[in-house]
Amino acid sequence: MEQPGAAASGAGGGSEEPGGGRSNKRSAGNRAANEEETKNKPKLNIQIKTLADDVRDRITSFRKSTVKKEKPLIQHPIDSQVAMSEFPAAQPLYDERSLNLSEKEVLDLFEKMMEDMNLNEEKKAPLRNKDFTTKREMVVQYISATAKSGGLKNSKHECTLSSQEYVHELRSGISDEKLLNCLESLRVSLTSNPVSWVNNFGHEGLGLLLDELEKLLDKKQQENIDKKNQYKLIQCLKAFMNNKFGLQRILGDERSLLLLARAIDPKQPNMMTEIVKILSAICIVGEENILDKLLGAITTAAERNNRERFSPIVEGLENQEALQLQVACMQFINALVTSPYELDFRIHLRNEFLRSGLKTMLPDLKEKENDELDIQLKVFDENKEDDLTELSHRLNDIRAEMDDMNEVYHLLYNMLKDTAAENYFLSILQHFLLIRNDYYIRPQYYKIIEECVSQIVLHCSGMDPDFKYRQRLDIDLTHLIDSCVNKAKVEESEQKAAEFSKKFDEEFTARQEAQAELQKRDEKIKELEAEIQQLRTQAQVLSSSSGIPGPPAAPPLPGVGPPPPPPAPPLPGGAPLPPPPPPLPGMMGIPPPPPPPLLFGGPPPPPPLGGVPPPPGISLNLPYGMKQKKMYKPEVSMKRINWSKIEPTELSENCFWLRVKEDKFENPDLFAKLALNFATQIKVQKNAEALEEKKTGPTKKKVKELRILDPKTAQNLSIFLGSYRMPYEDIRNVILEVNEDMLSEALIQNLVKHLPEQKILNELAELKNEYDDLCEPEQFGVVMSSVKMLQPRLSSILFKLTFEEHINNIKPSIIAVTLACEELKKSESFNRLLELVLLVGNYMNSGSRNAQSLGFKINFLCKIRDTKSADQKTTLLHFIADICEEKYRDILKFPEELEHVESASKVSAQILKSNLASMEQQIVHLERDIKKFPQAENQHDKFVEKMTSFTKTAREQYEKLSTMHNNMMKLYENLGEYFIFDSKTVSIEEFFGDLNNFRTLFLEAVRENNKRREMEEKTRRAKLAKEKAEQEKLERQKKKKQLIDINKEGDETGVMDNLLEALQSGAAFRDRRKRIPRNPDNRRVPLERSRSRHNGAISSK
């Protein structure tokens, strides 16, 4: 895309290239086409809400002088100098085109040129003030620039093709890195191209951008690339709105506000900053009802996340590290609060922000030293004071502190005293006294009362309520109060549970570290004891050879018993057992006979050939005194459970399956339900498809001539030096001193990555005398070449800076696996669940090769859900969960007992081992570098001094972690023996991943069972309610008929008299009064007197 100014250099000369000239006829045709296009171009009309000068100045910038400047409603990123630079210098260009254009045509083309450059009114003003000759020259240059590519029409067509390429790319369903590259390119195009290009793109492109944003927001698990794409989409929307057409399209799309509100995320401060800025602009320049639409979008987005609607904005203000986000949030608050015309609504919005946490944060925000933030805070305070002043004028100039409860009460009292509303106000206060004095319930009551009052006072229609309505408002809020109270209790309990869990993790970590330290000391004690024993032996040998008695035995170490006694001498006449006799000749290849069977068990005999189970009725000799499992004979053919059966040869003495007693769960009712739900049916399998995506990333290289460094290295060093902006000597001294206050991980990583090799640094050192003649990257190389052993030094410093991070990454993983192993072995509810599953499986597998199983592999638990019921409406997992809820509710506690299984499932033993090995290798390299490090020649060089103490600490921390890791692996190996699986082939991540998946599936099955029961109960109640309503309808018709036909048996006179008598006596309303019983316990004498005085019927519930 060529800008008009960029192409002018080729078209602004005094002559044209041969063959490039145009005849007068063709020039006239082009002028006519341009004039027609200018006349027929649709005008973009958008109603922009203007503000008074003082209000607008308060929001956009604080007034520092009394001179009022007219500012544009939509700010553009084009500076006046930049705008002028886009137009080429005015050159005398008087060809046939400029001479033949009329003054009106020149002015029309001049306006079109400025609009195509996306200039706002402030940037257009100085250009309009130029003389007519300059305007004519600029127009001719603009025509030449566009005509160079085939005329105005063809240039526009090329822009359309370019924008349609982006539309096609977005419509093709790209994602991840490819989408990120596309969005970045689109953002640049939306920023640099003229409005016509944005117009062509916006017809389809805006909807595609919103579709992509909605797709990313609906994604449950968002990766880092998804967050980057969201940010790029917001930037594209912001660029798209940077003109009247784009703003009009955004305001015209119903989804835009909701998606922008949903995308507000305090965890992504940069993206949230852009969003709240966009919403602030929309709030100011939008149509009259834009505030209602915006608040509706914010409310809908908050309801999706079950939170207060303004809490994300307040959380953005809490981010102390993102100052721009705080400024943007305060700006958005000011835009929202100052937009309504009604004073009541402004006060309501401001109070809602203050209740959400803004009130406690304002003092801290005012202490920050930032001009932009101070402006927004002053705007907030000034508007607040103005509203209070307006309110005081409304209240006859009575000044009050609205934030003080006592002042507000006295203000209300003075307003209502000696008026007809006084008694109603007194009745309201008396009702407040009836609220139960409970720590949890009282705040919830006032919360609901405040919501009701705000809805009544701030009615959306802007009209007063219907004061003629005299019927009692029968509203039962008991269930709402209870839910609010329960929610408050649950939140408090969850907070306490989180605190206790954190304390427990800290205590457990300290215990593991103490055990590791104790184990290390025990090993040291054993080594010392061995050395003492060896010294004693040597002393005895020396004393026996020289005849000098050896030294007396040293006393045992504290806490250590005496050394073990020497072995007893052989019995008299005894001798060690002789070796077994050699085999007889001729029997070398024959194996010895098998040993006799052990008295107390032992390995079972091998199974028959081919793994065929023995015929029924023949019992096997099971190890460790186990009994044969019961053979079940269901009355119907059951579905089979395809589990991995544990063979008797796999059992160990301490395994879980030896003490299983699943027969205690036997129940005829359970077997009957199994037979009913899991009779044999044909399974239906579904195929799944997988999609693959290719990622491409174009790279561009920038070539630059240098003396020694290659261009790429020089460019990287230039970027690095430009980002840090520190003197080269200061960078060198910070590295020599190992100054951690100045050093950062990013700084060292960039140096390690971008510095050239030592050989090139040595070559640069030779150019020290030509320092001033070198470019900046090579000057930096000259300075850094004076540091000895630079690369090992940087690697060691980087290891020191990241050591604490490595510890914090490794230690929680070890603790999580250790806790998960202990929880799994101690969980009684999980053991009972395994017993129940074993019983159900053996019953369903009766008559198959998996019948009478002693146990099953743990990974089978995730496959329970694959077994469908006969009607395909439920699964075996839902059935087991239902049985547990009905009869064995203690089993339902196992997900809580296995709390750390989820975190353990994310631990990779291989990565953990690799990280520990890498840490040890770095410590060894650091120790070696310190030993061979040359003596410091620079007074700033403190590398050896600081790294020596760090090496000692790092070694101690590593040994402690290594011991904890070994203990963790031993626990996992013991767990493999306990549940009969190979801990060497089944990884930690796989084992605990299966358990965590089963835990999640079980909880989901419990929720689905509860939902199913609720639906069944709801259907049953609806059916009963329908029958009851029909019955009541028949009764009312019957009573009405009786009332009318009272004189049916007599003559036809007196029907109306009877109706009037029934109405007068209340017989016609007797049933209605019975449906609204009054509670005599809630009656209060003052309330009754107040109600009787004003004919009020206020329920004192």
Curated annotation (Swiss-Prot):
Residues 98-464 form the GBD/FH3 domain. Expressed in testis, ovary, small intestine, prostate, lung, liver, kidney and leukocytes. Residues 549-623 form the FH1 domain. SMART domains: Drf_FH3, Drf_GBD, FH2. One of its GO terms (molecular function) is small GTPase binding. Residues 1-44, 536-594, 1010-1048, 1070-1101 are annotated as: Disordered. One of its GO terms (cellular component) is intracellular membrane-bounded organelle. The keyword Nucleotide-binding does not apply. Residues 1010-1035, 1078-1090 have a biased composition (Basic and acidic residues). Keywords: Acetylation, Coiled coil, Cytoplasm, Developmental protein, Differentiation, Endosome, Oogenesis, Premature ovarian failure, Repeat. It comes from the Eukaryota. Residues 628-1028 form the FH2 domain. Residues 10-22 have a biased composition (Gly residues). Residues 1051-1081 form the DAD domain. One of its GO terms (biological process) is actin filament polymerization. Residues 366-418, 487-547, 903-1053 form a coiled coil. The modification N-acetylmethionine is found at residue 1. Residues 536-546 have a biased composition (Polar residues). Residues 549-594 have a biased composition (Pro residues). Pfam families: Drf_FH3 (PF06367), Drf_GBD (PF06371), FH2 (PF02181). Belongs to the formin homology family. Diaphanous subfamily. Isoform 3 interacts with RHOD in the GTP-bound form. It is linked to Premature ovarian failure 2A: An ovarian disorder defined as the cessation of ovarian function under the age of 40 years. It is characterized by oligomenorrhea or amenorrhea, in the presence of elevated levels of serum gonadotropins and low estradiol. Could be involved in oogenesis. Involved in the regulation of endosome dynamics. Implicated in a novel signal transduction pathway, in which isoform 3 and CSK are sequentially activated by RHOD to regulate the motility of early endosomes through interactions with the actin cytoskeleton. This is Protein diaphanous homolog 2. It comes from Homo sapiens (Human). The lineage of its organism: Eukaryota, Metazoa, Chordata, Craniata, Vertebrata. The gene is DIAPH2.
